[in-house]
């Protein structure tokens, strides 16, 4: 529907004056000269008078004229319908006595305005578009009282919305079910409060429906995701009959789910996404009450899911059995709490079924894995009758095995994965209560397993013999306890059997060393006739290296295994008592093992000789001693060389662990068909590096991995001496790292620039210390270079964290097919930037991201020194940011204009401070530039907020097929046209449109008419006995604290009487009486209340009729009067800064009077005025008016309770310094 509108201002305002002479005073007998009672002149407000506004609308074949007459604070609207063709003219007659007409230039079409906020009221918004060709409707369901809703989003879809509801019959509609009363939903947050949101977006071409099921009261849900798939959703529910639908079962009441979080609270989420081409169904089974589940994953597979359940009859389905009540599962976490998760994903091409067996109560399970296989799973179980099955024998009660964890608690898991090409089933036997099992692996092999056992009659089976009591074996663990595991893996093509023989009690085995030989290994022996043999070089004296162990002894090893085309035999020679052995491996070989011994007569068989009693073997560990290792593994058909550089003497390196000691390592792995070299640069003496751990000590590492078909070199630059780097950890110490990873077909080089001496960098952590990092990643087919610019010495940068300390970072990410360079400009010295955080400190950041096919450059402009910018935060401090996002097919440049010095901008906030921002977003097929105009100095803008302060914003969004530029326009100044104004204006349907379109504001602000008053008891204890006398004369000099009444220092909870005297009400005259005046709204009660020991406070704005000098005239003052003019009448009035004072004269018995100058005032301006009159005993009285050089004006004729920009606080609030 094409709508054109012509809005014409014909409102001409005229002031009403009161023409009666000034009152003069006869000072000879102290009496005012009384005139006849003045007749009150009231402004004519009939509908035939101005001001009024006329709007002419043309819609299709109909024409409409609306005439609006504002009457006080309401409007009366009349509509006239015009017809097509030859129509009568429409004539409006108006008058003016100023000869001035105000014309406001129309704001540009397509402007979208909205207000997002939170608090205790119901707020909703609809985002409209100027693209009039879209028939769809966007509706915002009214949230329950107290509900807080908001969203930030961008993309290529021309219309976006949040919490929108539509009908089920519209293809591609989005429906958000109204959340329960009191439910809080949101997107980005931080701190110790629970924040939640449910986001759903539907594709215009999808015929299905995306529905968000009602979340139980108190449930917290959220998600953050990105990618190149045009439509994503979270917590979505659809019918079971729709192919590829996604259903999220309503979690039990009290369940907490989330994705991104920080601090010491538990946050969790359950994410499920279905593939459009999968005919099966993905279902999330109800999680037991109190269960916490979450996952984070990445890769190139378009569809992933977590905690998904389907029926057994559907090929390739995935089922997660409901864990026992109280079980805790999770993936990413920090601090000293237990977090656990169980992850399972099914492959579309697998005909079998993956099942997760119920875990015993109290058992903690988890896994982390990566690779290019689209589907992985953990904790899988199958039947014993299928050839090639994998079985995990139930370990003895008390056995501890685990994978990823932190703190001083025990965490446990058992992991098993089946291969897509194996027709058998993978089964995980119930683990005994308290048992901990786990594994970590990586590579391109689709399926790996740990702790597997099968029968002796099945070819290729793997059996783990129950170790003797007291034997210690383990994989991943932390704390001061002993954790144990025995690992064995069978190869699919091996016809023999892998057996782990009971280890003798008390035997300890290990081998740790390092050197300059390209290949090192421990407990490995091969024949001289086999190509690719493994040799153990004698390490240099004093070198310490290790991999797997536990306890208070030092155990060390370096393991390397060659795989692929070796036809020989790997033999593990008996180690002497006290030796510790273990293995971590990766590559393209389907099955690997450690602690293996082969016989000379069996080709390729592996046997583990029973170690002596008391032997300790492990993989990942912790304790109170220093443990170190360097691990490198060559795999597949790699023709290059894997080299472990000899660390300098005294260097400490290690892999995974936690505790109270320093553990560090440097790990490099080559995989696939890479013909290049993976090299770990020798860190400088004294440098500390580490990977995964937790505790109270400093842990650091530098990690580099080459993958895929990359022919280049992955190099970790030697950090400067004294630099501290690290990756994942928690605790109260400083942990930092610099991480770079090359992926896909990138032929370039990924380099981590050596940060300046003293710079601190880090990635993920929590606690009360400063943590910072700089992270750069190159992805997919980008042939360029990703570089992290050296921050200036002393600069602080960081990414995710929480606490009360300042954390900051600068992050840049290149994605898609961008051929340019992503650069983070070096911020000026002293600039503070950051992304996500919470607390009471100032945090700031500037973030820019390039997306999809944009060939340009994303640049973060240097903010001026001292400027403060930020994105997401909460607290009581001011936080601000400037954010720009390029989307879709925009070929231009996204630039964040440098705001002027002193400008404050912000996005999401809460609290009692001012928060402001300016946001601009480009969408659809816009080929122009998206620009955020530099706001003028001291301009304040804002978007989302809550609290007791004023917040404002300007938001512009471009939509549809507009090829131009989306710009936030600075409002033009009001244009005043003077001259002769016609009293009659004629319009017709055939009139030629004017060249300038005139817009009338929908609500012209001229203030709110009225005068406020409040009556109080006189309760100032210091002067009450002298002022409030029951007999004799009032001591007027005793009343010296006039600012007390109406202020926050007042002890009375509320006035005795309060109200507003309107322009048509009686003048506030108080003739001499023993009773209070009869003011509305309760005149009867007031005039029957005695006025002794009472005080009346008046507050109002005086609107100036004409430019002139003015005075306040008071009469009949009985007993004491004070007055304040200007801004101090609103806030800051005191007992000593009053502008007017009069009192009853005890010697003559005459009432007080006087005239007090208010200065020269401009026509139309507003002057704040506060007056107080108090009566001690006997009669009371008071009257006042205003006068200029020519006229006198009644008190209420020009009194206003509020202006367009100012208002008084309620009586009893504000102004604490009354004694100043």
Swiss-Prot record:
Glycosylation sites: 44, 72, 131, 160, 232, 304, 376, 448, 520, 592
Primary location group: other
Pfam families: GLEYA
Keywords: Glycoprotein, Repeat, Signal
Region (24 X 36 AA approximate tandem repeats): 110-973
GO cellular component: cell surface
Sequence repeat ranges per the UniProt record: 110-145, 146-181, 182-217, 218-253, 254-289, 290-325, 326-361, 362-397, 398-433, 434-469, 470-505, 506-541, 542-577, 578-613, 614-649, 650-685, 686-721, 722-757, 758-793, 794-829, 830-865, 866-901, 902-937, 938-973
Domain of life where this protein originates: Eukaryota
Family named by the database record: Belongs to the mam3/map4 family.
PANTHER family to which the protein is assigned, alphabetical: M CELL-TYPE AGGLUTINATION PROTEIN MAM3-RELATED (PTHR31492:SF14)
Protein name: Putative cell agglutination protein SPAPB2C8.01
The organism of origin for this protein: Schizosaccharomyces pombe (strain 972 / ATCC 24843)
């Amino acid at each position: 529907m094409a709508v054109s509108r012509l809005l014409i201002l014909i409102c001409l305002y005229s002031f009403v004056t009161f023409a009666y002479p000034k009152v003069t005073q006869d000072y000879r007998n102290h009496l005012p000269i009384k005139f006849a009672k003045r007749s009150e002149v009231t402004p004519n407000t009939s509908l035939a008078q101005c001001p009024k506004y006329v709007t002419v609308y043309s819609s299709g074949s109909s024409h409409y004229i609306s005439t609006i007459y504002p009457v006080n604070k309401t409007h009366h609207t009349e509509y006239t319908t015009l017809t097509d063709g030859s129509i009568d003219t429409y004539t409006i007659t108006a008058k003016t006595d100023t000869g001035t007409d105000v014309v406001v230039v129309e704001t540009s079409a397509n402007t979208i305005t909205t207000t997002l906020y939170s608090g205790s009221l119901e707020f909703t918004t609809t985002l409209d578009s100027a693209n009039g060709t879209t028939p769809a409707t966007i509706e915002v369901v009214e949230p329950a009282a107290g509900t807080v809703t908001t969203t930030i989003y961008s993309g290529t879809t021309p219309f976006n919305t949040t919490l929108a509801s539509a009908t089920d019959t519209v293809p591609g509609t989005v429906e958000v079910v109204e959340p329960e009363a009191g439910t809080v939903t949101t997107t980005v947050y931080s701190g110790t409060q629970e924040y939640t949101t449910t986001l759903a977006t539907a594709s215009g071409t999808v015929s299905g429906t995306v529905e968000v099921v009602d979340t139980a009261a108190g449930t917290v849900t959220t998600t953050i995701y990105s990618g190149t798939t045009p439509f994503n959703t979270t917590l979505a529910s659809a019918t079971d009959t729709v192919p590829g639908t996604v259903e999220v079962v309503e979690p039990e009441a009290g369940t907490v789910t989330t994705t991104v979080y920080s601090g010491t609270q538990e946050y969790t989420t359950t994410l499920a996404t279905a593939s459009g081409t999968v005919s099966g169904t993905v279902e999330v089974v109800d999680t037991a009450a109190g269960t916490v589940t979450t996952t984070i994953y990445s890769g190139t597979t378009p569809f992933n899911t977590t905690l998904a359940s389907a029926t057994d009859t559907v090929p390739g389905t995935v089922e997660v059995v409901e864990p026992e009540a109280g079980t805790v599962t999770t993936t990413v976490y920090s601090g000293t709490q237990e977090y656990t998760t169980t992850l399972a994903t099914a492959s579309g091409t697998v005909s079998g079924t993956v099942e997760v067996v119920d875990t015993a109560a109290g058992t903690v399970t988890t896994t982390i894995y990566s690779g290019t296989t689209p589907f992985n799973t953990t904790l899988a179980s199958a039947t014993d009758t299928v050839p090639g099955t994998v079985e995990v024998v139930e370990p003895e009660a008390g056995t501890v095995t685990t994978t990823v964890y932190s703190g001083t608690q025990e965490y446990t898991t058992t992991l098993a994965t089946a291969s897509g090409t194996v027709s058998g089933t993978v089964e995980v036997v119930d683990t005994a209560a308290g048992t901990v099992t786990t594994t970590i692996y990586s590579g391109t092999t689709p399926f790996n397993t740990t702790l597997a056992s099968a029968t002796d009659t099945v070819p290729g089976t793997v059996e783990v013999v129950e170790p003797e009591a007291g034997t210690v074996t383990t994989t991943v663990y932390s704390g001061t306890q002993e954790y144990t595991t025995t690992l064995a893996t069978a190869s699919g093509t091996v016809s023999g059997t892998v057996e782990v023989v009971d280890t003798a009690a008390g035997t300890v085995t290990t081998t740790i060393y390092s050197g300059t030989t390209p290949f090192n290994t421990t407990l490995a022996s091969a024949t001289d006739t086999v190509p690719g043999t493994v040799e153990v070089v004698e390490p240099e004296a004093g070198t310490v290296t290790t991999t797997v162990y536990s306890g208070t002894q030092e155990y060390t090893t370096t393991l390397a295994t060659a795989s692929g085309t070796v036809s020989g035999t790997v033999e593990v020679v008996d180690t002497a008592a006290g030796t510790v052995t273990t293995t971590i491996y990766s590559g393209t070989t389907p099955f690997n093992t450690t602690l293996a011994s082969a016989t000379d007569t069996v080709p390729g068989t592996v046997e583990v000789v029973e170690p002596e009693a008391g032997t300790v073997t492990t993989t990942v560990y912790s304790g109170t001693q220093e443990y170190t290792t360097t691990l490198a593994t060559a795999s597949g058909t790699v023709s290059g060389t894997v080299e472990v550089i000899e660390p300098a003497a005294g260097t400490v390196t290690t892999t995974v662990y936690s505790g109270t000691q320093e553990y560090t390592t440097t790990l490099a792995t080559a995989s696939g068909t890479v013909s290049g070299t993976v090299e770990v640069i020798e860190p400088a003496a004294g440098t500390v590096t580490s990977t995964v751990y937790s505790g109270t000590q400093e842990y650091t590492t530098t990690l580099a991995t080459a993958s895929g078909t990359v022919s280049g070199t992955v190099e970790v630059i030697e950090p400067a001496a004294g630099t501290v780097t690290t990756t994942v950890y928690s605790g109260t110490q400083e942990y930092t790292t610099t991480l770079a990873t090359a992926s896909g077909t990138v032929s370039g080089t990924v380099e981590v620039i050596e940060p300046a001496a003293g710079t601190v960098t880090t990635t993920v952590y929590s606690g009360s210390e400063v943590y910072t990092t700089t992270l750069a990643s190159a992805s997919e087919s980008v042939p360029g270079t990703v570089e992290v610019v050296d921050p200036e010495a002393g600069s602080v940068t960081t990414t995710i964290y929480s606490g009360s300390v300042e954390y900051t970072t600068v992050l840049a990410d290149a994605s898609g097919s961008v051929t340019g360079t992503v650069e983070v400009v070096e911020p000026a010295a002293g600039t503070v930037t950051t992304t996500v955080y919470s607390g009471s400190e100032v945090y700031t950041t500037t973030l820019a991201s390039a997306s999809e096919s944009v060939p340009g450059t994303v640049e973060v402009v240097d903010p001026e020194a001292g400027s403060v910018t930020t994105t997401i935060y909460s607290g009581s401090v001011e936080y601000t940011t400037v954010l720009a996002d390029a989307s879709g097919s925009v070929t231009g440049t996204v630039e964040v204009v440098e705001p002027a010095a002193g400008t404050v901008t912000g996005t999401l906030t809460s609290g009692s401070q001012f928060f402001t921002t300016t946001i601009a977003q480009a969408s659809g097929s816009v080929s122009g530039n998206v620009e955020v105009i530099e706001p003028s100095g001291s301009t304040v803008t804002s978007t989302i907020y809550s609290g007791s302060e004023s917040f404002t914003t300007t938001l512009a969004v471009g939509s549809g097929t507009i090829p131009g530029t989306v710009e936030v326009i600075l409002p033009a100044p009001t244009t005043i046209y003077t001259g002769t104004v016609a009293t009659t204006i004629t319009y017709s349907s055939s009139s030629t449109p004017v060249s300038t379109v005139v817009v009338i504001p929908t609500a012209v602000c001229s203030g709110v008419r009225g005068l406020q008053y409040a009556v109080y008891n006189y309760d100032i204890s210091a002067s009450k006995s002298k002022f409030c006398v029951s007999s004799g004369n009032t001591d007027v000099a005793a009343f010296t604290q006039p600012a007390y009444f109406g202020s926050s220092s007042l002890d009375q909870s509320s006035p005795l009487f309060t109200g507003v005297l309107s322009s048509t009400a009686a003048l506030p005259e108080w003739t001499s009486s023993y009773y209070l005046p009869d003011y509305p709204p309760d005149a009867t009660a007031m005039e029957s209340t005695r006025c002794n020991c009472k005080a009346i406070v008046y507050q109002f704005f005086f609107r100036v009729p004409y430019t002139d000098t003015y005075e306040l005239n008071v009469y009949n003052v009985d007993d004491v009067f004070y007055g304040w003019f200007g801004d101090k009448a609103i806030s800051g009035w005191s007992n000593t800064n009053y502008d007017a004072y009069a009192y009853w004269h005890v010697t003559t018995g005459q009432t007080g009077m006087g005239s007090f100058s208010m200065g020269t005032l401009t026509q139309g301006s507003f002057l704040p005025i506060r007056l107080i009159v108090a009566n001690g005993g006997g009669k009371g009285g008071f009257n006042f008016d205003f006068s200029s050089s020519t006229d006198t004006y009644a008190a209420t004729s020009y009194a206003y309770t509020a202006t367009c920009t100012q208002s008084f606080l309620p009586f009893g609030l504000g102004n604490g310094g009354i004694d100043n």
